[in-house]
Design a protein with these regions (language model features):
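OB-fold ssDNA-binding interfaces and closely related basic DNA-contact patches used
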Residues: 1-71, 80-86, 102-155, 159-162
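Intrinsic disorder/low-complexity segments in short proteins, especially the signal peptide
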Residues: 76-77
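Short acidic, low-complexity intrinsically disordered linear motifs used
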Residues: 173-185
Length: 185
């Protein structure tokens, strides 16, 4: 046994795949419906997959003596739904987070996330009929196709998280340039 401890020791990393939470244990992928606990902090991490950069939210969750880090792409229905539901509850109290995924009749994928507290699913704080201060999607034309830009909504949710978890939400890089910048020599 060693006195050295890795920061991630005792932490279960959870990702989302087609509406289920997944975790790799001993090389085997295990799936779960949801995760329960209290959110202690949320970090925004820049990462890369197959040469394409993206940003993910790393949601730190504690339940009894277990620690989880739920990771989700910031530019996803999972993240937007998670934030919208969490805002209508008490973000500092215990929650149950359950991602969802389905395809519509045309085969279009729809990702979402349900959040419950005290045994009740939380409604979205912002809706189409009552958007409040949530920025509207912007219509843009790209290569002749009309699309919707959600950049302002993503920034809105990141700012809300930073304020809600003040001192606990951080922007980090997957790897620092030097990795040893805080050494005294």
């Amino acid at each position: 046994m060693s006195g050295l401890i890795k920061k991630t020791e005792g932490v279960t990393y959870l990702n989302i795949k087609e509406g289920k939470l997944v975790s790799k244990k001993n090389g085997v992928l295990e799936t779960y419906d949801g995760v329960k606990g209290t959110i202690s902090k949320i970090e925004f991490v820049k990462d890369e997959y197959e040469g394409k950069p993206y940003e993910k939210a790393a949601i730190h969750i504690s339940y009894v003596d277990e620690n989880f880090i739920l990771q989700m792409h910031v530019d996803s229905g999972y993240f937007r739904n998670f934030c919208n539901a969490l805002k209508s509850g008490n973000p500092k109290e215990e929650v149950y987070i359950q991602p969802s995924f389905k395809k519509d009749d045309r085969g279009k994928s729809m990702a979402g996330c349900f959040v419950s507290q005290n045994g009740k699913f939380l409604k979205h704080a912002h809706t189409k009929d009552n958007p409040g201060d949530l920025p509207q999607l912007e219509k843009v034309t790209f290569k002749g196709e009309t699309r919707y830009d959600n950049s302002k909504q993503i920034e809105y949710w990141k700012n809300w998280i930073s304020k809600t978890f003040a001192g606990e939400a951080t922007q980090t890089q997957e790897q620092e340039e030097d990795g040893a910048t805080d050494l005294p020599f």
